[in-house]
A protein has these predicted regions:
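Flexible, glycine/charged-enriched surface loops at secondary-structure junctions
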Residues: 2-8, 60-66, 192
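Extended hydrophobic packing segments that form well-structured cores
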Residues: 104-192
Length: 192
């Protein structure tokens, strides 16, 4: 990272598992805690989003899968097997959900206001941006280890109808205005 002067790196997680027999979840968590943006599954759009969030807000973020979407209650559950330890109130070392090997991290996160953002499209010229409230840490057996239920301030059916990919980025606090200003200044189109 230092030699190449990198600010962010994606990891091809499932290839890593195939090659080494273990996961990179803990390594990615520790890199993020050290201020090196590290994302999963080779998702360059989400890694770019995480980098933009860090530069604009100074905050670390959580890359996650929308794993449960309830349009009726306007809630989603975001889940993933890695999160920077510094973002958690406490954490539990578990195995990786999909493979049941290696290390996955179940982070217990504080409740409160959050921002959800994703830069997308091949040219990174579209984005999703919303705020919500993290209301609960869940512990379902059928999804990745860190799980948070979020009551959205915009329609949750976006995740069912027009999502900009799978991973979305969550950060603590309401940063909608600063992110909106940056994305609009760069001629990006907001997707609702």
């Amino acid at each position: 990272v230092e030699e190449e002067r990198l600010s962010a790196i994606p990891s091809r997680c499932f290839r890593l598992i195939d090659q080494t027999g273990t996961t990179g979840c803990l390594a990615l968590a520790l890199l993020n805690d050290e201020g090196i943006i590290a994302g999963c599954e080779g998702d360059l759009q989400s890694v770019f989003t995480m980098l933009a969030v860090k530069v604009l807000t100074g905050k670390n973020s959580f890359m996650a899968n929308p794993s449960m979407i309830n349009a009726r209650t306007n809630e989603i559950i975001l889940a993933h097997c890695t999160i920077g330890i510094a973002q958690t109130e406490q954490f539990i070392i578990r195995n990786h959900f999909e493979t049941e090997i290696g290390i996955g991290i179940q982070g217990i996160l504080p409740t409160g206001d959050v921002t959800i953002v994703k830069c997308g499209n091949e040219s990174l010229d579209e984005y999703y941006l919303s705020t919500g409230t993290l209301v609960e840490n869940t512990n379902y057996i059928n999804m990745c280890r860190t799980q948070v239920r979020i009551k959205m301030n915009s329609p949750a059916d976006y995740f069912l109808k027009t999502p900009l990919g799978n991973h979305h980025i969550m950060l603590y606090g309401n940063y909608e205005d600063i992110l909106e200003e940056f994305l609009q200044a760069n001629a990006c189109k907001r997707i609702e």
